[in-house]
Amino acid sequence: MSSMVIGLASGSLEKLVVTSTVTGGAVALDMDVDIYLLLGGAYAFRKDVAGGGTYNDRPELAEEMAAGMTGNAVPAPLDSLRALKADGTVRIHCCGTAGKIWGAGALEDFVDLVDDIVGIAEYISRCEDADVVQVF
């Protein structure tokens, strides 16, 4: 089975939507997907942050994007990832250093989508072995 690794370095809504959409395509193609939450990605998955007012890379487009998602029944990215984890092989790993930077050093500091906390060497190793590597 082929595999994809995604390095999610941003916690912006755009990057979260792109990550969930690309993951959906990979699951549809029967690929294993490993998502590594790097700095901003780790922040977006903190329990006290997730799902609430994710920032946009282009704030002037935030309202239009929200309306477009609602009007086209595009699910919230974390809801989409939850469904994809149920449908395919999707694992979400948090970089330990990123978690510590945001004051979240333990697994219980993150939403239940996060499978584990790992070192950056694991991310690099998985990138070496993956068929497809994406960074958002």
How would you name each of these model-derived features?
Residues 5-16:
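Short, glycine-rich nucleotide/cofactor-binding loops
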Residues 17-30:
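Histidine-anchored nucleotide/phosphate-binding helix
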Residues 33-39, 93-95:
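Short internal beta-strands
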Residues 41-54:
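N-terminal beta-loop-helix "entrance" segment that forms/cooperates
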Residues 51-56, 110-113:
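Short, hinge-like loop/turn segments at secondary-structure boundaries
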Residues 53-88:
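A glycine-rich helix N-cap at a beta->alpha junction
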Residues 72, 82-86, 90-107, 111-114:
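Ligand-binding beta-strand-loop-alpha-helix segment within the catalytic cores
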Residues 99, 117-136:
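Glycine-rich, aromatic-bearing surface loops/beta-hairpins
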